[in-house]
Amino acid sequence: MDTVRIAVVGAGVMGLSTAVCIFKLVPGCSITVISDKFTPETTSDVAAGMLIPPVYPDTPIHKQKQWFKDTFDHLFAIANSAEAKDAGVLLVSGWQIFQSAPTEEVPFWADVVLGFRKMTKNELKKFPQHVCGQAFTTLKCEGPTYLPWLEKRVKGSGGLVLTRRVEDLWELHPSFNIVVNCSGLGSKQLVGDMEIFPVRGQVLKVQAPWVKHFIRDGSGLTYIYPGIANVTLGGTRQKGDWNLSPNAEISKQILSRCCALEPSLRGACDIREKVGLRPSRPGVRLEKELLVQGSQRLPVVHNYGHGSGGIAMHWGTALEAARLVSECVQALRTPAPKSKL
């Protein structure tokens, strides 16, 4: 088999980054990214994009740390390059604050971010309702800028992009030899995954250019994340809620919570509401599967279910998915042993 034809289903940060990584790791393949939604209509476009990872209960910590480190290193290199502005990647310093001491004093990612330390008493004076905190510098990756940048890289490597809704992975056979499933919440219908569910997130994008430091409540529910063009204020975590329409009452609550941490936000203007549905499950699904229909076989690599950690973990999981694709390609190119009968 000469050129292996690969379809990547999904064009959020997972689909596009996985396509880029496959081009890097798997020579002699053609890649088509297929999705019914492209930027600016993906969940990744709404994501705050801060590299502060969640913890996945069903995934070993050493694996989560590797995914995060791979992602941090990749984005740090971009932040230190001439591409930073076009890719929407920047370094941001700030504080994660707690109203009671966290169970885990030092998170698993502490030595991946820059300059992680306990907050001083003087720093904590800014947050009288909080008893302790952590100061560090991390990266912010802005979906509406980063996704077109990734898409450009896919096309620049010879990849194709196709707007189409896929109802069944078998539709892609035999046009494609391997399918990579990065369909996020779409996997509920597409592959019958009953473990995946939405966690609704509502945020505000505001103009407040004087806000330079991020502030994140330790619960992860209230946060202020300054970016290139605006400041993201959040948020909500509504399990099982599929509603994509902004709720005015929730917006008022978000603004009130954020102003309690940063009173100067009372002067913020041009407030815009955004809603995204995080594709959540107990652990990321990152594995190979061989679909069989009669004598037909279709190798599939799944890479979805990152919840609130999509951008924080994307490059690490994309690299791992690309390695799995490489194994599938190798299997296709290895002739089956002939029967001696």
Swiss-Prot record:
Domain of life of the organism encoding this protein: Eukaryota
Residue span of motif Microbody targeting signal: 339-341
Pfam families per UniProt: DAO
Tissues expressing the protein: Expressed in epithelial cells of the renal proximal tubules (not detected in the glomeruli or renal distal tubules), liver, right atrium of heart, lung, chief cells of the gastric mucosa, choroid plexus, pia mater, brain stem, midbrain, pons, medulla oblongata, hypothalamus, hippocampus, cerebral cortex, cerebellum, ependyma, olfactory bulb and the pituitary, pineal, thyroid and adrenal glands (at protein level).
Compartment(s) where it occurs, according to its Swiss-Prot or TrEMBL record: Peroxisome matrix; Cytoplasm, Cytosol
Entry's pH dependence statement: Optimum pH is 7.5 to 9.0.
Cellular component aspect of the GO annotation: cytoplasm; cytosol; peroxisomal matrix; peroxisome
SUPFAM superfamilies, A to Z: FAD-linked reductases, C-terminal domain, Nucleotide-binding domain
Reaction catalyzed: D-aspartate + O2 + H2O = oxaloacetate + H2O2 + NH4(+); D-glutamate + O2 + H2O = H2O2 + 2-oxoglutarate + NH4(+)
Binding of FAD, residues: D36, K37, T43, S44, M50, G307, I311
GO BP, one annotated term: regulation of cell communication
Molecular-function GO term, any one: D-glutamate oxidase activity
Keywords attached to this entry: Cytoplasm, FAD, Flavoprotein, Oxidoreductase, Peroxisome
Obligatory cofactor(s): FAD
Location (main, coarse): other
PROSITE patterns: DAO
Keyword set includes Transcription regulation: no
EC number, as in UniProt: 1.4.3.1
Enzyme class, UniProt record, top EC level: oxidoreductase
Function statement: Selectively catalyzes the oxidative deamination of acidic amino acids. Suppresses the level of D-aspartate in the brain, an amino acid that can act as an agonist for glutamate receptors. Protects the organism from the toxicity of D-amino acids. May also function in the intestine.
Subunit text: Homotetramer. Interacts with PEX5; the interaction is direct and required for localization of DDO to the peroxisome.
PANTHER family from the UniProt entry: D-AMINO ACID OXIDASE, D-ASPARTATE OXIDASE
Family membership noted in the UniProt record: Belongs to the DAMOX/DASOX family.
UniProt protein name: D-aspartate oxidase
Organism for this UniProt entry: Sus scrofa
This protein's encoding gene: DDO
